[in-house]
Every structure is written in C-alpha cells, then in structure tokens.
C-alpha cells in the first residue's frame, strides 16, 4: 500500500506525514512531495521513527516519483488562510495548484484514490474532477473532498458541551466544507439532547471553527495540526477499505446522486474501489432542513466556479 502526501512540507503535510508514519499498516510505503527543497529532509527526519513504514521525500517541480504506484494520494498543497481571508480568497492560488496536480495524477496514477484537503474544497474537488474527466480517467468513486475536520470538530465540541468521551460521539456532517455549507446533523447524535439555543450556537461554532484558529494563531497560520489528524483519520479509513475491511464509513465531499448539488458531503461507505455506496444522511430536524435549503445557492455557486475554471 503506497500513500502519497502532496504538499508534505507545509503545516498540514508535516503533521499528516508524522501521523501516517506512526499509523499506516506495517509494510506500507509513504511518499512525501512538496515544491519546497526541505521535503527530502522532512522524510529523513521521519525515517528515524521506529515503525515498519518506509518513507521517501521528493522536492522540485515534478511530483511524478511520489505519485508512481500510489494507491492513495492526499493533497494538502497550496497557501494557508491568513486573518481576514476566507476560503474563497485562497481560490486564486490554490485552484491552479490543484489543476496541475490533477493533470499529473491523470497520467501517473489514474486509478489512485485522491483526497483533496486544499481549500476551498467546495471548488477544488470539481476542478480535479473536470481535469480527470478531460483525460478520460475520471472515476467518481475515487475522488474525495476531505471534510473530516468538520466531523472531528463536531465530535469534540459536542463532547465538551455534554461531558462525553469524544471517542463515543458520532456526528454526521453534510453539505460542503466552508461557512454556511457545513451542516452538522446534531439531531442525529445518539444519547444527547440539545436545546434550540445549543443547536444554533454549536452549528455556528463548527462552521466558524477554522476562523477561530486563524485568529488565535494571530497571523501565524491556520488549522494545521487538527487538519493533519482529520486527514490521517480519512486516509487510514481509505487504506483499511482498500485492503478489504468491511463497513468503513466516513463523511466526505463526493460526486454522488445527491438531489441538492452535484458534489455533496455526506456519509459514504468505503470499499476496495473507493466509494462503495453513498449513504442516506437520514431524517433532518426543521432547523437542519432550513440550514440545508439556505446553503445550496452558495454550494452550487462554489461548484460552478470550479467547473468553469477547469474548462
């Protein structure tokens, strides 16, 4: 099993690489790529950790050696958010980066499962899909927007509020991966009750959690460590499913058969070919129905920007 981390010298990439070096199954290969010359050094540093995972790092303009033979590609390349920026401000730089990486993937490892972390995810995933479609290698079961950070934040905040073990809390999060498009389904959390005020406050906190971190870091970056953890959780779930484990379910932003938008985050069952089944997100509360209706114009607008950019 080969996993490639693209953008591996950045804050998310280094955190993700550290976690994967520790947690990938024995015998796995971990490849790190970044344009930054430090990348082989990041791999050398991580190679001293005593786990049965081999690691190599590649720098420069060409990600080909990292992508060759990859089963899973996790893309965190791009610029990070600064105070005052929203995820859409990242588009101008990151859209081009994702487009060129997707063009490489189409040639070098067209059958790999690709998880996109680079923001704005609502838009970068459609860009990658359009590139892969043009190349004739698109498989919608194998392209994911990684929205797991919204899930782990939801689990953490609910556990804090209700004095639960976060490991026992499950919160499906649907929609997209920015602002109002993030919709945690708090009505489906088992074993807890929320007041209307709690639902509203929690939903807003989850939607704005990225900004909370950007502001707390005071210009020094965005959510890198928690995002690394979220991407690791998603990447490991993919690896387990590809290796034949049954019943692996995570939320992800995929091209499915959603009636709401051509790309939509919801629970997906993972299997040996990527998405085995897009699962129903179940019954919504009135608050959630209203929030879903209210986000769709934004979400569909984000998707269209990506499709147009890739033309």
Curated annotation (Swiss-Prot):
Active site (catalytic residues): 177 (proton acceptor)
Enzyme Commission no: 1.1.1.37
Binding-site positions, NAD(+): 7-13, 34, 94, 117-119, 227
EC primary class: oxidoreductase
Annotated keywords: NAD, Oxidoreductase, Tricarboxylic acid cycle
Paired cysteines (S-S): none
Stated family: Belongs to the LDH/MDH superfamily. MDH type 1 family.
Function: Catalyzes the reversible oxidation of malate to oxaloacetate.
Name of the protein this chain belongs to: Malate dehydrogenase
Source species: Vibrio campbellii (strain ATCC BAA-1116)
Gene that produces this protein: mdh
